[in-house]
Design a protein with these regions (language model features):
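Bacterial N-terminal signal peptides that target proteins for export
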Residues: 1-8
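Acidic, contiguous N-terminal accessory segments
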Residues: 6, 14, 20-114
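Feature activates predominantly on carbohydrate-active enzymes
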Residues: 28, 43-44, 49-52, 56-58, ...
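Structural motif
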Residues: 37-43, 79-85, 124-126, 172, ...
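Beta-strand-rich ligand-recognition modules
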Residues: 683-702, 710-779
Length: 780
């Protein structure tokens, strides 16, 4: 019996030891690691790599890792180049074959090697950039907590980038909604973080006046050189966006432009790309622009021999496009590095097809705006467009993953257009998709939240970002997830006070509160408007003037009996925090934002979400009528504006809740912008399309209908392909065109409405014809 007991005790003991060893293998503890860096990694990247590892780990763990080029420590983080055989006497792990990621440009491999009781985490790269990207992957995947940094053991991960060019624009100018307030140190940290997520290029917009922004901490003429130095520190390409003189036909414009550029080139320690937009701004013909660029290239190469000249075809008409490509085909200039695809360029796939193979094709996608832009938010509720506007905090991982894969394939890479820190998540997403377009955005977001917020909240915060994007999907009043999103972020906010000063954290929480406040306001104000119309329904009994007075008093409760002020106060609280942390300018008056469209989301947080401003103006007009009958008739029309009766239908074009509209615009200029964002027009009039399409089913085939259209200018309407003649044709805003529709055209109860585009190419789009409202009214 004693022998049996002794056997089981020994067995249990051995099992415990094995279990402990197994437990220990679950993580690779780097808390006491020493850093070893190859001498082949030249300065400044050797110092940069060491400082990144030491500083970023210390920020998150309070651990101070050592940098000693020896193997005395039991745990080592070793940085080496793939072509090296040994690192301070230790063999560098190598794989067979020439097609490994770590042998390709910018590629790297992270590999855990265990030798007895010693652990080495290798970062092996093809070049010095690859070293930084390998460090980035290490820091993004490591779990860093107080006094501890761990990684999954036996890691063997490698990758090289799919796209050679992966960058973002950071124009140090007043137009930016935040970083015109940044110091050199803030730019250094931010560029570092972008590099750690895979970026390799940064584009500035030089030649700014010192007094052009009230937020400048440093003269822009100095900052444009400092940004060049930062790029050199991180081995990132430094690009500049520098338009040509507006009109090169003006005397001395050509030479003056060259002289200004030369002075800038001479003082930059690093410069890799010069992007000269063909238009936007400027309207130079390529016959004038190309000689200017040729001369510019000679000056550029005098100071930066390997830098390239790039040009876009923005705003080019057909003749200019043909001239440009004929020039490339006939002259084949070696001084031109490539063409940039930007807004109002020819279609991206056509531009790639026409571009000779010797030239690179760069994408210039707008990831910073939500309306009146390159990539509008799909199915966005008007209430958001009126309040959050064009530059809100806009993490949209799912939308941008789809758009990246749709468009970037025609190019050799990208430098995104950005004008603020509000699109930070989008930048990281694009950088990572530039490495691998098949990456799951869920994995990208998890690395983002783990690196910036820590492993404990990473999963929930990543979900919270997806939820913020979901908040913007479709009609607000039908979106049940908005309050759930707020609940998640409130919980994260309450339980993680240590993140209170983290600007990325502040942005996301602010959006959650803002969205919820808009939802509450919209529900409240829509109810007030519906109740105001019920008062107008009593106009025959009350009298027109009394009914208007009572209705206006009721609908204006939106301004006197406020809702959800606790949510609004939190939004303003975070507006102040963001101004203090990163200089975010969320208000023109309060924080000196450049303009109302430039991120000033606080200034529009209480913009009317019902038609009270419009009703006030309409009631003033009606008050001038001399006939009570006229007043009552107009009030009846207003009351039933969106309710044409049983068997009839109304659609506000481009509204998220329009049921019959089948068309979408591709640039979101369907949200009107006038009077600096404070339009008093009817809300439906502020949404439009130029040539919408609508579709109806199950109409009464035995009934005639009337199609009523509101908008501006022409309306060349077709019903099931047949052009209809109008019985009424008014062209002003909130006036009407009416088209009789006979039952002969809808024998099967199916109707498609379309609009031919009038010949208005000579007009600015703001003056072109558009459709705002469409009624299909059943005739009795």
């Amino acid at each position: 019996m004693k022998k049996q007991l002794k056997f089981w005790l020994v067995f249990i003991g051995i099992g415990s030891i094995l279990s402990c060893e197994k437990e220990q293998q679950k993580t690779l503890d780097l808390s006491q690691a020493n850093i070893v860096i190859s001498a082949q990694i030249k300065s400044p990247i050797q110092e940069t790599a060491a400082s990144i590892l030491v500083e970023e780990i210390k920020k998150r763990t309070n651990l101070q890792l050592g940098w000693n080029n020896n193997w005395d420590s039991k745990t080592t983080i070793a940085l080496a180049l793939a072509n090296e055989k040994e690192l301070f006497g230790t063999k560098v792990p190598a794989r067979d074959g020439e097609n490994t990621p770590e042998s390709k440009k910018e590629g790297y491999r992270i590999f855990h090697q265990k030798d007895g009781d010693k652990n080495t985490l290798w970062v092996i790269a093809a070049d010095k950039r690859g070293i930084l990207y390998g460090i980035g992957k290490l820091l993004r995947t490591a779990k860093m907590e107080n006094s501890k940094i761990t990684l999954n053991p036996n890691i063997d991960f490698s990758e090289s980038p799919e796209y050679a060019l992966r960058g973002h624009q950071f124009g140090y100018r007043n137009t930016a909604n935040s970083w015109d307030a940044w110091t050199v140190e803030q730019f250094d940290q931010h560029f570092r973080e972008q590099v750690l997520f895979g970026a390799n290029s940064f584009e500035n917009i030089p030649f700014q006046e010192a007094d052009s922004s009230p937020h400048f901490k440093i003269d822009p003429q100095i900052m444009e050189v400092e940004l060049s130095k930062i790029c050199e520190k991180y081995d990132a390409d430094y690009w500049v966006w520098t338009p040509a003189p507006h009109d090169l036909t003006i005397k001395n414009a050509h030479q003056d432009g060259l002289a200004e550029q030369e002075a800038f080139y001479a003082k930059c320690p690093r410069l890799d790309g010069v992007f000269v937009p063909g238009g936007d701004p400027g309207e130079n013909h390529p016959s004038k622009l190309m000689p200017y660029l040729k001369d510019l290239s000679e000056i550029l190469h005098k100071y930066h021999p390997n830098a390239g000249i790039w040009v876009s075809l923005q705003g080019f008409n057909k003749e200019k496009v043909e001239y440009f490509f004929n020039y490339l085909n006939s002259e084949s200039p070696d001084w031109l590095k490539g063409v940039v695809y930007g807004p109002s360029s020819p279609p991206i796939e056509l531009e790639r097809e026409m571009l000779p193979k010797k030239y690179l094709h760069r994408f210039y996608p707008d990831i910073t705006h939500t309306v009146r832009c390159h990539y509008p938010v799909d199915n966005w509720d008007q209430a958001y467009a009126l309040t959050l506007g064009r530059e809100p905090i806009n993490p949209q991982p799912l939308m941008y993953t789809q758009l990246f894969n749709r468009d970037t394939k025609y190019t050799d890479g990208f430098i995104t257009y950005s004008d603020g820190s509000h699109d930070d998540l989008n930048k990281v997403l694009w950088s990572q998709l530039g490495w691998d377009s098949k990456k799951n955005p869920k994995d990208i977001l998890h690395e983002y939240t783990q690196f910036f917020f820590g492993p404990k909240v990473a999963e929930k915060a990543a979900q919270g970002i997806f939820d913020l994007e979901k908040n913007w999907d479709g009609p607000i009043l039908e979106n049940e997830s908005i309050k759930e999103t707020l609940s998640l972020w409130k919980s994260l906010e309450d339980n993680n006070p240590d993140l209170a000063n983290n600007w990325r954290w502040q942005q996301l929480i602010m959006r959650a509160y803002y969205d919820a406040y808009i939802q509450d306001r919209l529900a409240y104000e829509k109810r007030l408007e519906a109740e105001a119309y019920e008062i107008l329904d009593q106009a025959n009994a009350l009298g027109a003037d009394k009914a208007m007075s009572d209705a206006l008093e009721h609908i204006n409760k939106a301004d006197t009996e406020l809702v959800s002020q606790d949510l609004k106060e939190k939004v303003f609280e975070y507006g102040e925090k963001l101004f203090q942390s990163i200089g975010a300018q969320t208000s023109v008056d309060k924080y000196q934002a450049r303009s109302a469209e430039r991120g000033a989301i606080l200034d529009f947080i209480d913009y009317p979400l019902n038609n009270r401003w419009w009703l006030e103006d309409e009631f003033k007009k009606i008050g001038e009528y001399t006939s009570e009958a006229e007043k009552l008739a107009r009030l009846e029309f207003i009351r039933n504006y969106e309710s044409p009766g049983e068997g009839s239908f109304y659609d506000n074009i481009s509204s998220a809740d329009a049921r019959h509209v089948t068309s979408k615009t591709d640039d979101a200029i369907d949200f009107l912008w006038e009077n600096n964002g404070l339009s008093r027009k009817r809300l439906s009039t502020q949404l439009f399309q130029f040539t919408p399409t609508l579709e109806y089913r199950d109409l009464d085939p035995d009934s005639d209908y009337l199609i009523r259209v509101s908008g501006y200018g022409e309306a060349l309407l077709r019903a099931n392909g047949e052009r209809l003649k109008p019985a009424k044709y008014e062209k002003g805003f909130e006036e009407f065109k009416e088209f009789p529709l006979t039952k002969a055209l809808i024998k099967d109860g199916h109707l498609k409405i379309s609009f031919d585009k009038p010949d208005e190419e000579h007009l600015n789009w703001r003056k072109q014809s558009r459709v705002t409202d469409v009624w299909l009214i059943k005739q009795q």
